């Protein structure tokens, strides 16, 4: 067993240091950015804020609201194909992600959703434990199946696993285990990592 005894930080531990600016008002700040990705030729422009793929936040209703502001929603994986069919016309494909799990049924559902609108660029592969070896293999399989999609994978919290997922074909890695306000992973399982340090370290992968 190895114990890490250096200081790790959460967002509550830090403040943003002010600095000189040429802006007169916060309303002048432009949040939109242009993005390119490692494994696909797809590009994206918008505000890089994602609503998570939880069943309470990654909803069609959330997506309709956030797309007006060029923000993204990872639609949760519990919707059926029929529910997708009923809502697909209300969704801007630039600002949503399909979410799937690891099973063959998930893979097939992903294919069928993209058949409804192949302009959807994002595919989120979501599992409870991103540290399993079979998850890395699943990311490789999804990359081979959807070579032009922007693939998101997670969750993990450390640099070495972030690197493994990127090498397997992920363009974006979801960072964080247990930081959510209602998440019980840390209190029940004792597993996690202070979120700010986790993001900082994983960004070097």
Regions found by a protein language model. Give the residues of each.
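Active-site entrance/lid segments in N-terminal catalytic domains of soluble metabolic enzymes
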Residues: 1-205
């Amino acid at each position: 067993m190895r114990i890490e005894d250096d200081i790790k930080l959460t967002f509550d531990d830090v403040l943003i240091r002010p600095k000189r600016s040429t802006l007169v008002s916060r309303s002048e700040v432009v949040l939109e950015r242009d993005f390119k990705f490692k494994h696909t030729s797809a590009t994206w422009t918008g505000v890089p804020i994602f609503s998570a793929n939880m069943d309470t936040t990654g909803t069609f209703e959330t997506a309709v609201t956030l797309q007006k502001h060029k923000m993204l929603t990872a639609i949760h994986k519990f919707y059926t194909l029929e529910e997708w069919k009923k809502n697909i016309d209300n969704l801007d494909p630039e600002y949503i992600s399909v979410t799937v799990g690891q099973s063959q049924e998930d893979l097939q559902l992903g294919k069928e959703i993209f058949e409804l609108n192949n302009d959807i660029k994002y595919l989120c592969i979501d599992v409870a434990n991103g540290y399993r070896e079979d998850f890395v293999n699943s990311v490789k399989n999804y990359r081979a199946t959807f070579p032009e999609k922007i693939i998101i994978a997670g969750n993990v919290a450390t640099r070495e696993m972030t690197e493994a997922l990127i090498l397997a074909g992920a363009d974006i890695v979801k960072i964080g285990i247990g930081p959510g306000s209602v998440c019980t992973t840390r209190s029940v399982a004792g597993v996690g990592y202070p979120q700010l340090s986790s993001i900082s370290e994983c960004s070097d992968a």
